[in-house]
Amino acid sequence: MVVIPHWHPSQNYGPRKKGGHPQLIVLHYTAMDTTEAALQRLCDPQHEVSAHYLISPKGIIWQMVDEAQRAWHAGAGCWGDIEDVNSQSIGIELANRGDHPFAEAQMVALEGLLRGVMARW
C-alpha cells in the first residue's frame, strides 16, 4: 500500500543539526479532543511544536514537515547516545486523547506510513 499524505505545512521546523538524519521514529498521541485541534496546534507558530505526520482515527494522514527537516516533537529528549532526538527522528502524532483505544483505521494507516518511512531512511 502506497501512502500519500495530505500536505498541511507547519512553520514549526528547522534544519537537522550536525548533519543528522532519521535513525528513530517517535510515536506520540496528541492528548487533544479532536484531530482538527491537534492539526491547528502543530501548525501554530506560537506553540513551537510540530511533527512530521498526524494520523486521524479515520486513517487520514497529514504531513506537516518534510522528512528531511527537523520537526519539533521530542523536546530536549535523548535516546541512548542520541542527544538531539528531533534531529535524528521522524515524529508521528496519533490523534487520540489517551483515554481510549486507537482506531483500527488509524493503526492500518500507521503501519503503511511506517513501512514507507523505514524504506526511505
Regions found by a protein language model. Give the residues of each.
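N-terminal catalytic cores of peptidoglycan-degrading enzymes
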Residues: 1-83
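Oligomerization/assembly interface segments of phage tail-like spikes and tubes
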Residues: 25-27, 90-93
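Long, well-ordered alpha-helical scaffolding segments within enzyme catalytic domains
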Residues: 46-49, 86-91, 97-121
